[in-house]
Amino acid sequence: MKKIVAAETGEGVLRLFFHDGGKFRTREVPFAPFVLLADGEAVPEGCTVTPLSGGGFFRRQAFFPSAEACEKALPELKKSPRTAVFRDTVQQALSMTGLRLFSEMTFSELRRMQFLVVPGDDRIAAIRLTLPDGMPRELSGDEAEIIAGFAETIRESDPDVLEGFNCCRADLPLLVRRAAKLKIPLACGRDGGDFTVRQSRYTAGDKQYSYQKFTLAGRHIADLLHAAQLYDAVHRDMEELDLPSLRAYFRIGAEYPPALIRALAEILLPAYFYRTRELPLSFQECLLRGSGSALDALMTAEYLRRGLAIPLPEPARPYAGAMTGMEVAGVFRGVRHCDVRSLYPSLLLNRGESPRRDEAGIFLDTLRRLREFRLAAKDRARALPPGPEQRQQQALQSSFKILINSFYGYLGFAQGSFNDFDLAEKITATGRELLGKLVRVLLDHGATVIEMDTDGIYFQPPPGGSAALDAALTAALPEGIALEFDAEYPAMYSYKAKNYALLHADGSIHLTGAALRSRALENFQRKFILAAVTARLTGDGDGARRAYGEWKTAIANHAVPLADLAKSEILSDSPENYRKKLAAGSTRRSAAYELALTAGRPFRAGDKVRFYVTGTKAKVSVTDNARLLEDGEKSGVRDENTAYYLAKLDALADSFGIFDGKKG
C-alpha cells in the first residue's frame, strides 16, 4: 500500500489514511498489540504466543486479545527485565505489516497548514493561519468563535500536518486550556477527536528537552522549534533560535509569521519526511527520535517481520573516540579541507563485519542499500536543473546521509538491541589510524595540519603546489575509501580546538565553535569577536586593538545600544513551576525567571526573556541587578553597569591575546 499519510491503532485494527483527491479515505488492517518475552517469562493472561527463531534473548512474541488488555498489563510487564515493551503501538503495527508512511510520495504532496496563536490577557486574541494552498487567514474577534473557527478550519482544510513554532510549549497549551475553559470541543482529528497531550522528552545534541507532546488522530504535529534545535545541534552556528533570527539565518523573505513557519518547514522538514518513508515510525516520532533509537526501530522491525528473536543490548562501556583536535593556532593562508567520504559507514562496508548479534546480517545489507539509494539521489540532483525536482532529490540524499552516518554511532548506542562496542572500538581505531596516516602524508610533504574533525582535515599546502600531495593522499587510502578535496579558503584562523574561523572567497566569514559564537555571549561580544577575527583573517594587523578601543569607549560613554548588551534566555519551564521548584529547593535563582515573575505581564514556557545588568561595580549578582531590556528601552534612562561590561570586554580581549600578540 502506497501514499499512506497517517496511521492510528484502534481496537484490533490499524487504521490507515490515504489521499484521495482533495479528501482522504481510510482502510483498516488487523492488528494486535504485543510484547516480547524471554524464555521462562510468564505469558500475560489471554495472550497468544508466537515463537521467534534464532539465538536472541527475546524468543517469544505475546499478542494481546485487545488494546485494553495490553494497557492493563503494561505497568506490571515494564518491571521485568525479561520483557521488552514497545510503547508506541503505531511502531508495532508498521513493524509487523511492513507498511511505511509517505511511501512513493514527495514532500510537496503533503497537505500542510501553519498556525500561530496570538495571546491576549489570559485569552486568545487571534489565530493566524496559512492554509494548505498557501493562502493566509486570520481568525479574530470573540474568543469562543476564534477557537471554534480554528477547529472548523482544520476540518475543512484537512491538513496532514499542522506546523507551528514553539507550539508545544506556547500555542497548543493555551489553545487547549482556553477551549476547556469555554467548553468548546476541538474535534478536529480525522476520527472526530480532540487533541491529546502527555509529557515527553527529546534530545538535540548534548541537550535534553522536556515538552508537552500533542497528538491529533490522523494528523501530524510538527514544532519547528524542535527541528531548529536539531539542526543547530549539528551545525552549531545559530546565534538565536527565535523566528526573526531563523528568518535571517536562512534568508527567508516571508514576514507573515505562518508564511515564515511554512518556508522554514520547507527547509527543515523534508529530511525527516524522507526518513519516515524508511522507518516504522510516524512523522512526529521520526522528528524527535534520536538516530540510535530510529535505527534500532528499523533493525527490530526487520527481525520481527522475519520471525527472528531480538537480542538484549550489550552493557555500555567506554571506548576511545574519533581523532579530533587542533594542531596549531594562528592565521593561515590558502587553506584546503579534505574529507574522507562517509568515513565510518565506508569503513563498516569495507570491513564487512556486522554486529555480533545480527545473525541475519541485516545491518550491513541495510547500510549498503541505503548508501546506494543515497548516491543515486545525489547523482540525480547533480544532473537536474534547479527547481522542485532537484530540491526533492537533494532533500532525499541529505536525509539518507544522516541515516547512513548513524550506523556507526548505533554500534555504541547503549539502548540498541544490536549494539556492539567491540566493533565500534575497532571501526573507531581504524578511522583514527587512517586519519593519522593522512596527517603523516601531509607533514611528509611539507603541509601544515591545522585542525582535524571526525572525518576530515584542514591543512595549508606546501609551497609550490598540491598535485603531488593530492596523489599521495589518495594513494594512502585503502580500496573502497574515497577522499574528497571539498573546499579551499583564502584564510583560516585557528583559535583553539574545535573553534576556528574560515574566510571564503566571496569575503564572507564563517565561525565555528562555542568560544566564537555561543548564544551565551551578549551581542556586543559577538560583534567584537567578529571584528577581531575579521582583522586577523584580512591581514589588518591593528584591527583587533582598534575594535577593542572603539568598544571600550562606546561602553564607557553609554553609546552601545542596550540590545547589544542584553542577554537572551528561553524559559524552559513556566515561571510558576520555577517558583514552586525554588521553594522546594530543587533549582537555583535565575535572573530570567525572577524578571518573568515580576514583569507585570504573562510569560510562558518557551518565551524569550531579554535583560541587561545594572549597578556600578564590575562584580555584582546578575540575578539581583537584572532589568528587562524592554523596560530599560522604554524608560530612556541609561542605567547599564558599564564597569561590568568593560570587565567582560577586557576578559574577552585577554582571551584573544590582543595585547600580547598571542592567539594569532
Q: Where do the PLM segments sit?
A:
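C-terminal, non-catalytic extensions of nucleic-acid polymerases
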Residues: 467-474, 478-664
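Conserved beta-strand -> loop -> alpha-helix junction used to position metal-binding or nucleic-acid-contacting
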Residues: 183-226, 481-490
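Common nucleic-acid-contacting/processivity interface regions adjacent to the catalytic cores
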Residues: 254-342, 346-349, 389-441, 451, ...
